[in-house]
Amino acid sequence: MKVRTKGLLFDMDGVLISSLGSVERSWQTWAESKGLDARETIKTAHGMRAFETVRKLMPDGDHAAELKVVEDLEMEDIADLQVLEGVVSILQLLPQKYWTIVTSATERLARRRLAVAGIPLPARIITADMVANGKPHPEPYRRGAEILGLATEDCLVIEDSTSGAKAGHAAGCKVLATTFSHSIDQLEAADWIVESLGKVKITILHEDQGLVLEFTSLK
């Protein structure tokens, strides 16, 4: 299958990098300190902004203070952070005008993880603390398209979560999902599904005509 687009909007965790170990350990530590169910806390946190997770699980708590506790735990825990398959070769190929990152992490945490991973950082990215509404709301991906100077229908979102795929569609983008964290059935909001970016070939077209992605969709 070949898909043509003018810009790529990458989610971060589960698409470019895996910080799953850090995320789960940090939320488990926080949950246990608050007497919350760790498994349910981790499930709630995936694909949702940390602030929203804290607010949902502790509606009467000091949300800003609790967010800082979780973020500090995640900032310190980077031992097993990994760059995912296919990411390095794709980002080495792409000039930065063609892509940016749209993540549910805060800017502080996103920049920390990307630096540790050695991933080149676009001049501007969209993070949790830059939007009023997190995924699955369309705002994050609308803002990402604005960074690239493109209409949302000219952008392809690359996601690994249900909420992220829904956000991309709600923004008016097509969505390519990877199966890093969710099953094919859970990613029904995506237009196409691949195992990882290692299964995707990208060609840059001449004269600023955009990009062509080639892959075999699992959907």
PLM features per residue range, with description:
Residues 1-43, 60:
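Active-site neighborhood of HAD-like aspartate-dependent phosphohydrolases
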Residues 36, 40, 55-89:
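Metal-dependent phosphoesterase signature
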Residues 26, 53, 86, 109-112, ...:
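Phosphate- and divalent-cation-binding pockets in alpha/beta enzyme and binding domains
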